[in-house]
């Protein structure tokens, strides 16, 4: 039988205690526990403990240690159930202890995937202007159930998606001033797909660009690229020269009519 001979507070933490024991060969350091474990098991000087009781004490101490690690991890931001499990596995915590810790965290409402998903959707839509597809993918990667994700995305109605998509279009199109209107639309389309917006939202938003088409900007872009290709292919003569310029400008999204007008203007310039 093991007897507790001394209990002393650790110097670095007043909530942890060193337990000294005697197994019949004199006093020795036995183990350390958190204050809650000390009180839960009624540990005190002179208490006799057998191997089974000692095993329970040490197991509960490991659970408490992992629980406090999880609480510390949660103190920075909300986490999902899977994120807590992954965090504890990296700390080399056993699965039985992880299950017990997660169960306690759920009971104490420190983790709640439904609340997490709603908060995540609001942040990603309002702050980062992410589309629902990217948001869903992000939540799935954090272990949130598909049904919970679908419910949480109700916080992100189509009207808000379109508002965000139009905001991104307005913000990004300024960087495509030297592109043809068609090429600008293609690049904006690609950007919105990467951001996670659905095809129908993208089409509706890009349709609004038709009314905003800037002919002056289109001409500036045509002249910018046209003059560049004029220089690039000037070593060629006649039909070969014009054909290469036409193909290059067509790939940039300019219409045949626009290209022909540009080439005619260049001929007149001499």
From Swiss-Prot:
It is found in: Cytoplasm. GO terms for cellular component: cytoplasm. Its main location: cytoplasm. Keywords: Cytoplasm. It comes from the Bacteria. GO terms for biological process: regulation of DNA repair. Modulates RecA activity. Belongs to the RecX family. PANTHER family: REGULATORY PROTEIN RECX FAMILY PROTEIN. NCBIfam families: PRK14135.1. This is Regulatory protein RecX. It comes from Bacillus mycoides (strain KBAB4) (Bacillus weihenstephanensis).
């Amino acid at each position: 039988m093991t007897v507790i001979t001394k209990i002393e507070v650790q110097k670095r933490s007043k909530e942890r205690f060193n337990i000294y024991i005697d197994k019949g060969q004199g006093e020795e350091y036995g183990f350390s526990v958190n204050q809650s474990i000390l009180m839960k098991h009624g540990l005190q000087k002179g208490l006799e403990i057998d191997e089974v009781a000692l095993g329970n004490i040490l197991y509960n101490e490991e659970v408490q240690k992992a629980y406090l690690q999880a609480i510390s991890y949660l103190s920075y931001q909300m986490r999902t159930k899977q994120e807590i499990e992954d965090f504890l596995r990296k700390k080399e915590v056993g699965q039985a202890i992880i299950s017990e810790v997660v169960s306690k965290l759920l009971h104490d409402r420190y983790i709640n995937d439904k609340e997490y998903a709603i908060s995540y959707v609001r942040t990603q839509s309002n702050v980062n202007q992410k589309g629902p597809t990217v948001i869903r993918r992000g939540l799935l990667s954090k272990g949130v159930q598909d049904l919970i994700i679908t419910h949480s995305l109700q916080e992100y109605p189509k009207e808000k998606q379109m508002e965000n998509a139009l905001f991104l279009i307005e913000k990004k199109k300024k960087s495509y001033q030297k592109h043809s209107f068609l090429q600008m639309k293609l690049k904006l389309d690609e950007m919105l797909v990467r951001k996670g917006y659905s095809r129908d939202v993208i089409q509706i938003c890009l349709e609004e660009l038709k009314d905003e088409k800037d002919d002056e900007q289109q001409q500036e872009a045509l002249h910018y690229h046209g003059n560049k290709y004029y220089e690039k292919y000037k070593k060629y003569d006649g039909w070969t020269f014009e054909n290469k310029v036409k193909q290059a400008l067509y790939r940039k999204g300019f219409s045949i009519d626009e290209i022909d007008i540009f080439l005619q203007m260049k001929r007149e310039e001499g």
